[in-house]
């Protein structure tokens, strides 16, 4: 016999079915639950159903979440990258989980404001053709694209060269999917700033207690106030 659920219960069931867990992000806005359901629609368009590879999207989400003063997003999305009982990368049950070591390397990368950006721009600008595939995790191309993405994300009014380099590497159509993902990540960050009551889930507290270096990189980042 089919059990009828209230609309919001149906919504939470849908979210949990996609991520493998129910993130507290999608349990916020209790006073206007219909609003968070609309935000879920944007999450699907810009992030979950975006045709970029799942691990690439999730690593991009984690990387850009370094620059958000609220720590909820970086912690939760690292959980998604790690998989298992922490959820699924970009809601993809087929995504291969990353290791703690891979995540730590990502978090240790210098930001654009801690490095010389010229080589990053040149690497993308000198490509002789649009990339046929999205970069592999931990590759030089991913590093360059993420560095340019950070400039575009944090300083959009001063990011013309970064944007042009990304368009050159990706082509116009894939750049739009890339920028759509950035737009949702920005929205998610702003939402957590407006809802500081959103708490990190228990699974991530347990993980951080067992991995002190990872916890430090997540919670104590000098780039968080960008």
What are these regions (language model features)?
Residues 1-226:
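Hydrophobic alpha-helical segments
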């Amino acid at each position: 016999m089919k059990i009828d659920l209230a609309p919001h219960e149906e919504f939470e069931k849908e979210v949990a079915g996609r991520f493998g867990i129910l993130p507290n992000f999608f349990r916020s806005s209790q006073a206007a639950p219909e609003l968070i359901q609309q935000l879920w629609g944007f999450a699907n368009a810009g992030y979950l159903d975006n045709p970029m590879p799942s691990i690439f999207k999730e690593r991009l989400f984690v990387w850009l979440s370094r620059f958000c003063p609220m720590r909820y997003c970086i912690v939760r999305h690292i959980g998604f990258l790690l998989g298992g009982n922490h959820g699924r990368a970009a809601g993809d049950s087929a995504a291969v989980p990353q290791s703690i070591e891979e995540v730590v390397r990502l978090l240790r990368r210098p930001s654009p404001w801690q490095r010389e950006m010229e080589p990053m721009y040149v690497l993308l600008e000198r490509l002789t053709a649009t990339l046929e595939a999205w970069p592999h995790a931990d590759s030089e191309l991913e590093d360059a694209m993420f560095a340019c993405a950070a400039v575009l994300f944090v300083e959009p009014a001063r990011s013309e060269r970064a944007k042009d380099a990304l368009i050159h590497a990706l082509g116009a159509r894939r750049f739009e999917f890339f920028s759509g993902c950035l737009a949702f990540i920005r929205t998610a960050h702003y939402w957590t700033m407006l809802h500081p009551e959103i708490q990190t889930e228990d699974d991530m507290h347990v993980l951080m207690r067992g991995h002190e270096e990872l916890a430090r990189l997540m919670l104590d980042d000098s780039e968080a106030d960008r």
